[in-house]
């Protein structure tokens, strides 16, 4: 092989090495996105390769190597949302809107997306119950699940989303009552004090609207409860929400009087109460000076004249009072409010003459008085407007000749698109600038516009200009926009407008451009003029995506370009090789400091590199080698996943336990330093104490006090030979509870153990319980309190049931594990034994009306032998079962657990403040005859310090 060929091959190999180590996407993120790609029948075009951040996958936004945004609206995606989505732990935005072929339930572990701010699934076909785990998305601001097929009830846990701004579940099949908190543990929607939007319309929600739902502390501006099955009266507490601007309670089964306390909502712009079962008379609402729209149609109100106070509403634009048994003549000043545009009074008993007089609003366009008793009509001399008097006596006498005797005919021909452009090819549309293109199209649904007339084209021209100006201001790839086909839904009076958005500089959008435009609407980034009110945008399927624009007109040009690119790549590789060599040199220099943070530590001097220890000593390798007789087999007393545990004797005669990390468990130097600093701060008589460490000769060792009587598991199983009567079990429960409460509440920073079990509770020579195996893994972000959690992900039988949904372990997870330990102390059984789960066995067997709750056959024989002195037994069982409640919010804190055990001990005639349990004459025999207390299952170290966020396995 020639030297030139060899050099070329080396260069190629080097290039592939660079590529292999320089992927720009975090491994778990890449795996999650590839799972999406595999799950979807029609993944987005351009999702090629295995490095989404590096190859710029459509709709994917990254920061560094982490995926922070997925925006894939209106891409005709088909399939389900796989559980792998939960691995995108840095994701802030998930927008899959307007993909109607996306179906199935949302994965329960969607709650693992702890940094998610925007969850936008509008216009898909997702179904099933909204996952309870959504309540764990503490950063969530925007939750849009409308226009899907969700069923079931609203999860109460959504009340925990303290930052939620937008909550939209409209147009689904959600049923049941609105959840409110119970004031103690159960959350509810009344806790959403920062939320501005409750959009719950067009579902199957039922029951009374809870009075507890509303308070003066809320920030709501839109409450849209229309099209449900709510019953009862409007709660008075609603009037406390002074920020409300839109209230839609129409199309329900509400009863009682329309309350006068609605006058307190002085910022209200739109009030919809139509199609309910209200009775009584319409109250005076003259305090609502900002009211644009009032709709009280189709209620069984008492016969009454047209209220004169209507003319005192200065902002009123649309008035609907259809079918509410109005009678008598129309007051002469009725049409005088200066902003009044539309009046609908049909299906009443209004009599005499329709006379607009001279004091009529200059804005008035449309008056509908069909099906009344009008006998005469005097048109306004100075105003052209549309009046409908069909099915009134005046029309029966005049016949069908006058135009006002014809039923309404809506004009939907208005369009801002030009009609004088040259014809376009089939499928294309002419833009306002007469360019033929494939526009991105859809329908704007305005849920409560403050006008109802379809005749004033000025409003729609304003809308068209506002949308175009928005896209121009923020540099969207948009040439122009147009609106057309304006119509009103007669059922709910929503205003529907077709929108066309034309691409800039090309015939069609690419997927990125179209997603940007769609996101502006799905995320409500675009805000329409206020008169249009809240809206949703339902996009049409867009398939005319432009391909990547590559010039291929000349093969010679292609060859030339290829040659130039080849030379550039070669030079680039040579440059990279040089840079790589320099960086490797510097990296090697840095590695010394990172891998050995104690390298510059002079024990005789003060140094910033010295670990800040509290009572822990730095041992040399030679010191520990000597005290373990060269780590002899005789001193090998067990171990776990971290490595082996050796017994040693210090020169002063003190017994120590040395945990020696095996190669696969070694941490980074800085991580090890951080860990020993934190472990050295833990000082409590019920927690195994760190005496020191060794970071020498590429070894990492932790030195602990030696606990002679092994684990609680050994004693319960009979392995240790120690007899545990009821008194001793209570003292062990109290001691281990105090140790765990210390870790939660007094350690600095607080520590979440994450693997509480009987193997990790050790007993000293006095049977004092000591919590072990709380090796640290990472700080958990909490603005109020910083916790440290352990690497261990828990043990079957002790594992918090909520973990399976959230993949998160908390202080309440430790409480659950401790509750299982309490039941172990009671039964002497392992958590799972012969396929039976001790928690379920106790719950099933228990009968509170009988002695000892009828649990005798489950109790440990040692307890049965002392059954005559089981004072506090029932309270102990109650406490254990509270600790193993399915939901963490229903479990006590460890501080509360300790207080209850102290009370139980007092009931048993014991002093909860005594320092130790009773001694045992079997201690020496146990130590000699049962093997070492640090057996293979005991005291398993969990101290691997992950460099990045801990992910579920």
UniProtKB/Swiss-Prot annotation:
Signal peptide: 1-23
Gene Ontology BP term (one): protein autophosphorylation
Knockout consequences: No visible phenotype under normal growth conditions, but mutant seedlings exhibit reduced accumulation of intracellular calcium in response to extracellular hydrogen peroxide.
Description of activity control: Activated by autophosphorylation on serine and threonine residues in response to extracellular hydrogen peroxide.
Keywords: ATP-binding, Cell membrane, Disulfide bond, Glycoprotein, Kinase, Leucine-rich repeat, Membrane, Nucleotide-binding, Phosphoprotein, Receptor, Repeat, Serine/threonine-protein kinase, Signal, Transferase, Transmembrane, Transmembrane helix
Cellular compartments per GO CC: plant-type vacuole; plasma membrane; plastid
Start and end residues of each Protein kinase domain: 631-905
Disulfide cysteine pairs (residue numbers): 421-424, 434-436
Organ and tissue specificity: Widely expressed.
Active site: 755
Effect recorded for residue 424 to S: Loss of activation by hydrogen peroxide
Cellular compartment(s): Cell membrane
Transmembrane segments: 559-579
Modified residues (Phosphothreonine): 786, 789-790
Post-translation changes: Autophosphorylated at Ser-606, Ser-607, Thr-786, Thr-789, Thr-790 and Ser-942 in response to extracellular hydrogen peroxide.
Ranges per topology, Cytoplasmic: 580-953
Keyword Thylakoid: no
Annotated glycan sites: 182, 217, 264, 284, 298, 411, 456, 459, 510, 523
GO MF, one annotated term: kinase activity
Binding-site residues, ATP: 637-645, 659
Membrane topology: Single-pass type I membrane protein
LRR repeat residue numbers: 64-88, 89-113, 115-137, 138-162, 164-187, 192-216, 218-241, 242-265, 266-290, 292-311, 313-337, 339-361, 362-384
Sequence segments annotated as region (Disordered): 912-953
Protein task: Leucine-rich repeat receptor protein kinase that acts as sensor of extracellular hydrogen peroxide. Required for intracellular calcium influx in response to extracellular hydrogen peroxide. Mediates hydrogen peroxide-induced activation of calcium channels in guard cells and is required for stomatal closure.
Protein family according to the UniProt entry: Belongs to the protein kinase superfamily. Ser/Thr protein kinase family.
Protein name: Leucine-rich repeat receptor protein kinase HPCA1
Organism: Arabidopsis thaliana
């Amino acid at each position: 092989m020639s030297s030139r060929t060899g050099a070329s091959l080396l260069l190629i190999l080097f290039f592939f090495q660079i590529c292999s180590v320089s992927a720009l996407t975090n491994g778990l993120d890449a795996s999650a996105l590839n799972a999406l790609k595999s799950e979807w029948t029609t993944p987005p075009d351009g999702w090629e390769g295995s490095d989404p951040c590096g190859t710029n996958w459509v709709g994917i936004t990254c920061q560094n190597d982490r995926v922070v945004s997925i925006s894939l609206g209106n891409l005709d995606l088909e399939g389900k949302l796989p559980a792998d989505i939960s691995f995108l732990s840095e994701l802030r935005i998930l927008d899959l809107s307007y993909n109607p072929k996306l179906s199935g339930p949302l994965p329960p572990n969607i709650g693992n997306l702890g940094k998610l701010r925007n969850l936008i699934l509008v216009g898909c076909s997702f179904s099933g119950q909204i996952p309870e785990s959504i309540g764990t998305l503490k950063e969530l601001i925007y939750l849009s699940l409308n226009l899907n097929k969700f069923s079931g009830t609203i999860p109460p846990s959504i009340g925990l989303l303290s930052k939620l701004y937008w909550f939209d579940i409209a147009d689904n099949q959600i049923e049941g009552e609105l959840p409110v908190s119970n004031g103690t543990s159960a959350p509810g929607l009344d806790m959403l004090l920062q939320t501005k939007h409750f959009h719950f319309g067009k579902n199957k929600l039922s029951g009374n609207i809870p009075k507890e739902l509303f308070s003066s502390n809320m920030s709501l501006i839109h409450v849209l409860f229309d099209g449900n099955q709510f019953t009862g009266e409007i709660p008075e507490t609603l009037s406390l929400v002074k920020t409300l601007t839109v209230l839609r309670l129409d199309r329900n089964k509400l009863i009682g009087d329309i309350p006068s306390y609605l006058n307190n909502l002085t910022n209200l712009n739109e009030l919809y109460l139509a199609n309910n079962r209200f009775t009584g008379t319409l109250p005076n609402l003259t305090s609502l000076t900002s009211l644009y729209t009032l709709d009280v149609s189709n209620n069984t109100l008492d016969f009454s004249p047209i209220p004169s106070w209507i003319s005192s509403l200065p902002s009123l634009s649309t008035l609907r009072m259809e079918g509410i048994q109005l009678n008598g003549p129309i007051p002469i000043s009725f049409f005088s409010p200066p902003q009044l545009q539309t009046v609908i009074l049909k299906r009443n008993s209004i009599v005499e003459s329709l006379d607009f007089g001279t004091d009529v609003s200059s804005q008035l366009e449309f008056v509908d008085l069909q099906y009344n008793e009008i006998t005469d009509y005097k048109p306004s001399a100075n105003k052209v407007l549309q009046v409908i008097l069909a099915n009134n006596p005046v029309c029966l006498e005049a016949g069908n000749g006058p135009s006002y005797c014809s039923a309404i005919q809506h004009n939907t021909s208005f369009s801002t698109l030009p009609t004088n452009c040259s014809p376009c090819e089939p499928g294309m549309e002419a833009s306002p600038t007469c360019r033929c293109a494939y526009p991105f199209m859809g329908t704007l649904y305005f849920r409560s516009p403050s006008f109802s007339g379809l005749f004033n084209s000025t409003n729609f021209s304003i809308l068209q200009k506002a949308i175009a100006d928005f896209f121009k201001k923020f540099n969207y790839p948009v040439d122009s926009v147009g609106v057309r086909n304006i119509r009103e839904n007669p059922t709910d009076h929503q205003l529907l407008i077709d929108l066309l958005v034309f691409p800039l500089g090309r015939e069609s959008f690419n997927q990125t451009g179209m997603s940007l435009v769609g996101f502006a609407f799905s995320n409500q980034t675009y805000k329409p003029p206020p008169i249009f009110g809240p809206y949703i945008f339902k996009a049409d399927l867009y398939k005319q995506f432009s391909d990547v624009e590559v010039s291929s007109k000349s093969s010679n040009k292609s060859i030339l370009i290829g040659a130039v690119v080849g030379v550039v790549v070669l030079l680039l590789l040579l440059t990279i090789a040089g840079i790589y060599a320099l960086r490797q040199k510097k990296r090697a220099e840095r590695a010394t400091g990172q891998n050995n943070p104690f390298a510059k530590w002079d024990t005789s001097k003060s140094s910033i590199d010295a670990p800040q220890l509290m009572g822990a000593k730095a041992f040399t390798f030679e010191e520990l080698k000597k005290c373990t007789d060269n780590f002899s087999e005789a001193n090998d007393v067990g171990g776990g996943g971290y490595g082996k545990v050796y017994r040693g004797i210090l020169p002063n005669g003190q017994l120590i336990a040395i945990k020696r990390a095996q190669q696969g468990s070694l941490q980074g130097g800085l991580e090890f330093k951080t860990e020993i600093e934190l472990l050295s701060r833990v000082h409590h008589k019920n927690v195994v104490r760190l005496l020191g460490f060794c970071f020498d000769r590429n070894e990492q060792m932790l030195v602990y006090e030696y606990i002679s009587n092994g684990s609680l598991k050994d004693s319960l199983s009979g392995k240790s030979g120690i007899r545990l009567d009821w008194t001793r079990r209570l003292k062990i429960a109290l001691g281990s509870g105090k140790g765990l409460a210390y870790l939660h509440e007094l350690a600095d920073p607080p520590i979440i153990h994450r693997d509480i079990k009987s193997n990790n509770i050790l007993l000293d020579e006095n049977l004092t319980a000591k919590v072990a195996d709380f090796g640290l893994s990472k700080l958990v972000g909490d603005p109020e309190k910083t916790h440290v959690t352990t690497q261990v992900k828990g043990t079957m039988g002790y594992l918090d049931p909520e973990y399976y949904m959230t993949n998160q372990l908390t202080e309440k997870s430790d409480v659950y594990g401790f509750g299982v330990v309490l039941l172990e102390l009671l039964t002497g059984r392992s958590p799972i034994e012969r396929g039976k789960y001790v928690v379920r066995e106790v719950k099933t067997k228990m009968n509170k009306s009988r002695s000892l709750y009828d649990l005798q056959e489950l109790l440990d024989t040692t307890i049965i032998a002392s059954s005559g002195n089981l004072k506090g037994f029932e309270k102990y069982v109650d406490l254990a079962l509270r600790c193993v409640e399915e939901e963490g919010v229903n479990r006590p804190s460890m501080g509360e657990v300790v207080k209850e055990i102290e009370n139980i001990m007092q009931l048993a005639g014991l002093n909860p403040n005594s320092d130790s349990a009773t001694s045992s004459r079997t201690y020496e025999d146990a130590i000699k005859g049962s093997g070492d207390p640090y057996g293979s299952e005991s005291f398993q170290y969990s101290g691997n310090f992950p460099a990045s966020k801990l992910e579920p396995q």
